């Protein structure tokens, strides 16, 4: 992964690198590989993530179609 450093601005380059790594899911992957995960636990986690993803998409679709009200903004 490469990030250009312009005008010796290392802070900006680091922010860009972190953003790229976040988007690619590298931080999450590193956290997951910290400890061994049994194959059965991995399957269960992936299934739970898939269920969560499907529910979220269904909720967004229902909000878009006007079946349920959109969540109010927090104060």
Swiss-Prot record:
The keyword Ribonucleoprotein applies. GO terms for cellular component: ribonucleoprotein complex; ribosome. It holds the Pfam family Ribosomal_S21. One of its GO terms (molecular function) is structural constituent of ribosome. One of its GO terms (biological process) is translation. Keywords: Ribonucleoprotein, Ribosomal protein. Belongs to the bacterial ribosomal protein bS21 family. NCBIfam families: S21p. This is Small ribosomal subunit protein bS21A. It comes from Agrobacterium fabrum (strain C58 / ATCC 33970). The gene is rpsU1.
